[in-house]
Amino acid sequence: MGKTPGKWIKTLLLGKKSPKSNSDNRSQKLKSAKKEELVESVTEDLSNLTVDPPVVSSQPVPASTAQNVVSPINGDESKDNLESRNDLGEVELEQAAIKVQATFRAHQARRAFRTLKGIIRLQAVIRGHLVRRQAIATYSCIWGIVKFQALVRGQKARSSDIAIQFQKKHMEASDSEVLQSSTCSWMDNPTKFVFVDKLLASSPTALPLKIQYGPEEPNSAKVWLERWTQLQVWSSGSRVPRIEIPKSQSKKRNYQAVVEAEKKRPKRSIKKPSGTTSGTGPSRFTAERNKPKRNVRKASTLSKDPLRNESDKANHNSRKSRSGSKEGSPLEIKDEKPSPSLKRSSLSNGSKKATLRSAEKKKKDIPDSSVQIQPEGKVSENVLEGGDNIEFAEKEKDTTDSVQIESEGKVSGNVLEGGEGENIVFTEKEKDTADPVQIEPERKVLEEGDNIESSGKEKDTGDSVQIESEGKVLEGGDNIEFGEKEKDKADAVPIEFDIVKDEKSPVLDRTEEDELKTAETSDKAEALKCADVKVSSENGNVGSDNTKQSEKRALLPANIDKQDDGLTLSGRKIPSYMAPTASAKARVKGEASPRFAQAKTEINGALRRHSLPSPANGKLSTTTMSPRAQKLLLASAKGSMNGDKSFTSSKDITHKSTRTDWKR
């Protein structure tokens, strides 16, 4: 029929062309004809017009012209009437087409409905037949299975001894007749089997399994069917619900039993000590005795830190060694295990040189000895017969590009044989390295009884300059020796000084030390012209009158000179308002270092090294000098060097390679 049924109907009734298209063509023709007629009428009117002037006698002429003019108006009205008639015809045609289309569509719908109805009936017939055949087949199969089961079970029941005894004693003929009559009572109503008979009769091909029994047999087909229908196995309510214990319940029971057992175990463990020792004194003792065991286990896990272990051992062993030295019991000292390297180093009991040399050898043989040093600071202790020897080393590196700080605290308590006091070695190394700058101060303190040796090294290398300052303090009683050396050299020439040699020990015998101390202190006192300081060759006591003045003079220049050029002890710059004035520097330097004032007039610009006159052995060992005198000497030396720095930096600017610039 197509998408537009109206066109189909029009083509069916009027032919190939639709009436709508014909009416359109007609209307277009009418319009074109009207236009042509109007044009013709206008041209005729124009041709009829006269050029001559009007005459009086010819009065009816205008009327004729008026009639000719009005005539086209009447023609237009007639044309409008024709168009309206044509429009009415088109509307009637459209209405007729709509009616025809509606009737045709209703006819098609009714026909489709009939076909669908017939298809549904046909499907019901076919499906019903298939369902019936399937139902018969299933019924026959189930019937045969149930009959076979009934035969087997009946045979087993009859063959059993219990059934035979029951039949002999309790079963009688009357009872069997009553039972048979009750079971076969449904045979009177044949209507119960009508549906089954019809179902079986409709399909002769699907025959069930037939096992012939007599009517009196309880396992015959009819009797079995009666019993089966009475039980109503197919209904859901007739089924007996099975009461089974699932495995989950057993698991839950087992889990509960395990949980109860676990709950009982800690209760038993808690009840045992309380039950055995109920409220008595020993019970409390045992309860308290059990508590530390748990704490000991925790402490054992926490005591794996090597720092704590070794520090505790060091403190414990040092206490034992001190108590042994005071009480004089050699048994406690023998219990400690000395290292083999320290045994080799302890040569004699009485000589002090041997003790000091053994201490120095111990420094060198640290990697070979049992004293193991690790960079995070580990404490190891080695004890021999005698006093204590403690070495503490700390290294600190500060780099501007990559700051690396390594602190090493090393304490090794070594009790040497024949030592009267405590030998303490304190070494501190601090390295502050910028890109080309390296500063390494070192101090070493050796105390023999009350003797202390302190040495500090500072290395400041600029582009090609290296400065090393060394100080030695040897204190005998109250006597302190302190020396400082500074050396500068340009054009990348490194200078190094060994403060303490292996074989040349700064501590001599008592007799030799006394002679050297007396000789050197007298020379130094005369050279420095320290009238207010009185040096004693034996005890090194200072006069009480000039003590405060010498302390002020010794400390003030050191503090001012170390702050020279805006630098503090740590090398950091201080603000300008905290820096000392030029007048104070000049006054202090003039009082403290008069003999080095002439060094400022040098022309070459290079820094000059000022050092004290060395003795015959090449070492500065003014051990008999008092600490105040040594501070004054240090202040004078530093003041002169700072003056030289300021002079050379202001004198020659071009000698950049030879100047010492403190850099961060």
Curated annotation (Swiss-Prot):
GO cellular component terms listed in the entry, alphabetical order: cytoplasm; extracellular region; microtubule associated complex; nucleus
InterPro entries per the UniProt record, alphabetical: DUF4005 (IPR025064), IQ_motif_EF-hand-BS (IPR000048)
Region spans: Disordered: 1-85, 244-488, 502-573, 637-664
Record's subcellular location: Nucleus; Cytoplasm, Cytoskeleton
Residue stretches spanning the membrane: none
Listed Polar residues bias regions: 536-547
Keywords: Calmodulin-binding, Cytoplasm, Cytoskeleton, Nucleus, Repeat
Biased composition, class Basic and acidic residues, residue ranges: 76-85, 305-315, 358-367, 427-447, 502-532, 652-664
Protein origin, superkingdom: Eukaryota
Described function: May be involved in cooperative interactions with calmodulins or calmodulin-like proteins. Recruits calmodulin proteins to microtubules, thus being a potential scaffold in cellular signaling and trafficking. May associate with nucleic acids and regulate gene expression at the transcriptional or post-transcriptional level.
Record protein name field: Protein IQ-DOMAIN 28
Species: Arabidopsis thaliana
Taxonomy of the source species: Eukaryota, Viridiplantae, Streptophyta, Embryophyta, Tracheophyta
